[in-house]
From Swiss-Prot:
<feature type="disulfide bond">
    <location>
        <begin position="63"/>
        <end position="141"/>
    </location>
</feature>
<dbReference type="InterPro" id="IPR001675">
    <property type="entry name" value="Glyco_trans_29"/>
</dbReference>
<dbReference type="Pfam" id="PF00777">
    <property type="entry name" value="Glyco_transf_29"/>
</dbReference>
<keyword id="KW-0328">Glycosyltransferase</keyword>
<feature type="binding site">
    <location>
        <position position="268"/>
    </location>
    <ligand>
        <name>substrate</name>
    </ligand>
</feature>
<dbReference type="GO" id="GO:0003836">
    <property type="term" value="F:beta-galactoside (CMP) alpha-2,3-sialyltransferase activity"/>
</dbReference>
<dbReference type="GO" id="GO:0032580">
    <property type="term" value="C:Golgi cisterna membrane"/>
</dbReference>
<feature type="binding site">
    <location>
        <position position="232"/>
    </location>
    <ligand>
        <name>substrate</name>
    </ligand>
</feature>
<feature type="glycosylation site" description="N-linked (GlcNAc...) asparagine">
    <location>
        <position position="116"/>
    </location>
</feature>
<dbReference type="GO" id="GO:0006486">
    <property type="term" value="P:protein glycosylation"/>
</dbReference>
<keyword id="KW-0808">Transferase</keyword>
<dbReference type="GO" id="GO:0097503">
    <property type="term" value="P:sialylation"/>
</dbReference>
<dbReference type="GO" id="GO:0010706">
    <property type="term" value="P:ganglioside biosynthetic process via lactosylceramide"/>
</dbReference>
<feature type="topological domain" description="Cytoplasmic">
    <location>
        <begin position="1"/>
        <end position="10"/>
    </location>
</feature>
<feature type="glycosylation site" description="N-linked (GlcNAc...) asparagine">
    <location>
        <position position="81"/>
    </location>
</feature>
<keyword id="KW-0333">Golgi apparatus</keyword>
<dbReference type="InterPro" id="IPR051757">
    <property type="entry name" value="Beta-gal_alpha2-3_sialyltrans"/>
</dbReference>
Length: 342
């Protein structure tokens, strides 16, 4: 990783000097004759060319288009806030009071533990800031696949395409064994909350979305004493995951998604939408698979044989239609590419 960065810096420096000198020579050729030789004039012209290049805005990535670039869609510009931090780490482990009070109401937690003490203990166990997704650079072009769990993935044959991405983000149960041709086999990051936890491969980063203080407490004990085994349903006492692979989704970012992108629809965002907006902030190119109904209008998971098994959509917690429209709008303005499946 470091070697690649150094190489990129060298390439950029060489290109910068080459372009500057070439630009100067071409410009100078049109202004003076071969018989004119004024060192002061040459230096002045060269300095002016350098100033022009420095003023040229630096793009946030090396892709043909970068998600975070503004000015293409007013709808997007009014919602996207590049200052929002999707990860909660030891460096920013402070939840603003308004975000904290809003977050506490999501699942009606009673008598929560002190949040500051909880975060201090948590980041004494996990580093929370050593993941490739947390490293950004203007010389990169990060291609991310966000893979949902819709039944429209069945017989889609998207597997190879999904696996070709730099990062593959999945969520909740999301089995891959037996479904590789449709959903792929590669996973780099997996979104979970305590009630949806599944054992992951050793090289997969686990992004925990906390909806209450108890969720953060669960991570602490699941990696140490194993004392918590129940939230509102049974949860594992212990989890098998490397501590450096545990990442925390920022509660303030959940509020940002709810207010900016959902416009306060539903009680709070689904894991699916949280993962899509998360990807907008950490990736340069985002391709979305496995969202929405199948071609027959059924809302179910790709591993379910019962096509009508879509009761999860009627819980009243999430506004599925509004969330899906947000995804479609992002696709229509070419901030993401949306694969509809079958």
């Amino acid at each position: 990783m470091v070697t690649v960065r150094k190489r990129n810096v060298k390439v950029f420096t060489f290109a910068f000097v080459l372009i500057t000198v070439t630009s100067f020579l071409l410009n100078y050729k049109h202004q003076v004759t071969m018989t004119t030789w004024d060192p002061k004039h040459i230096i002045s012209q060269f300095s002016e060319q350098v100033r022009k290049l420095i003023k040229f805005p630096r793009r946030p990535c090396s892709c043909s288009t970068c998600i975070s670039e503004l000015g293409h869609s007013l709808w997007f510009d009014q919602r996207f806030n590049s200052t929002m931090q999707p990860f909660l780490t030891s460096q920013n482990a402070l939840i603003p009071e308004d975000s904290y009070r809003w977050w506490l109401k999501l699942q009606g937690e009673k008598s929560p533990k002190n949040i500051n003490d909880t975060l201090k203990e948590l980041f004494g166990i996990i580093p929370g800031d050593r993941d490739p997704l947390q490293e950004r650079g203007t010389f990169s072009c990060r291609r991310c696949a966000v893979v949902g769990n819709s039944g429209n993935l069945r017989q889609s044959q998207y597997g190879q395409d999904i696996d070709s991405h730099d990062f593959v983000l999945r969520m909740n149960r999301a089995p891959t064994i037996g479904y590789e041709s449709d959903v792929g086999s590669k996973t780099t990051h997996h979104f979970v909350y305590p009630e949806s936890y599944k054992e992951l491969a050793e090289n997969v980063s686990m992004i925990v979305i906390p909806f209450k203080t108890l969720d953060l407490r669960w991570i602490v004990t699941a990696l140490t004493t194993g004392t918590i085994n129940f939230t509102y349903v049974p949860v594992p006492r212990k989890i098998k995951v490397r501590k450096e692979k545990v990442l925390i989704y920022n509660p303030s970012f959940i509020k940002y998604v709810y207010e900016n992108w959902l416009q306060n629809h539903g009680r709070y965002p689904s894991t699916g939408l949280l993962s899509v907006i998360f990807a907008l902030h950490v990736c340069d190119e985002v391709n979305v698979y496995g969202f929405g109904a199948d071609s027959k209008g059924h809302w179910h998971h790709y591993w379910e044989n019962n096509a009508s098994a879509g009761a999860f959509r009627q819980t009243g917690v999430h506004d599925g239609d509004f969330e899906f429209n947000v995804t479609l709008t992002l696709a229509s303005i070419e901030k993401i590419k949306f694969f509809k499946g079958r």
